[in-house]
């Protein structure tokens, strides 16, 4: 499928919502199927969990990764780059950088802009203390997803937290990592066991 953009840099056939200042209201562009109530927000306040997102404030919602991907597609980008800042058994930090396509909000040939100037970066981490037991096996992926979500959200001024960004540990103790496992089959360790 090929997406066609008009002279303003917007996808043809898409109904965009606008703010009073004529910029795009990217928050309004999030389809309801990509949102759901933030269970933690309601539990912390001993309030019943709503069955729909209707009428909820942004701080009472979470956005799915699918919603962030949809926003990035609507906005348009040239490329996405990831840099691993830190990668240890119990802590991974990743920086995501996105080269956005110019549009009327930040045109390519505006004063001070040159091709490639529409770049935004953000960073996120995943640790054994802020992920669930299952996710602790995939810290690199979780950190990359969190960085992507933050990069898109912050560039487009979206104040709904991404589901991928929140602490999913539920207060449980992290899985104990045995640092010596990586050396378990090293020749010296095999000899020491005999």
Language-model region placement:
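Polyanion-binding surfaces on beta-sheet-dominated domains and ring/shell assemblies
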Residues: 1-192
């Amino acid at each position: 499928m090929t997406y066609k953009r008009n002279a303003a840099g917007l996808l043809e056939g898409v109904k965009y919502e606008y703010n009073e200042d004529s910029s795009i209201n990217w928050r309004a562009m999030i389809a309801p199927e990509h949102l759901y109530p933030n269970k933690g927000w309601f539990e912390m306040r001993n309030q019943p969990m709503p069955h729909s997102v209707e009428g909820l404030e942004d701080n009472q919602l979470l956005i799915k990764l699918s919603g962030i991907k949809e926003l990035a597609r609507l906005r348009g980008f040239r490329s996405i780059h990831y840099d691993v800042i830190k990668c240890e058994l119990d802590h991974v930090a990743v920086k995501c950088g996105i080269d956005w396509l110019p549009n009327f909000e930040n045109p390519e040939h505006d004063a001070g802009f040159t091709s490639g100037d529409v770049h935004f970066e953000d960073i996120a981490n995943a640790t054994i203390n802020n992920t669930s037991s299952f996710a602790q096996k995939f810290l690199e992926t979780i950190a990359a997803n969190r960085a992507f979500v933050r990069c898109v959200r912050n560039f487009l001024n979206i104040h709904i937290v991404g589901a991928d960004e929140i602490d999913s540990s539920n207060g449980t103790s992290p899985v104990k990592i045995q640092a010596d496992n990586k050396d378990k089959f090293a020749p010296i360790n095999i000899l020491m066991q005999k």
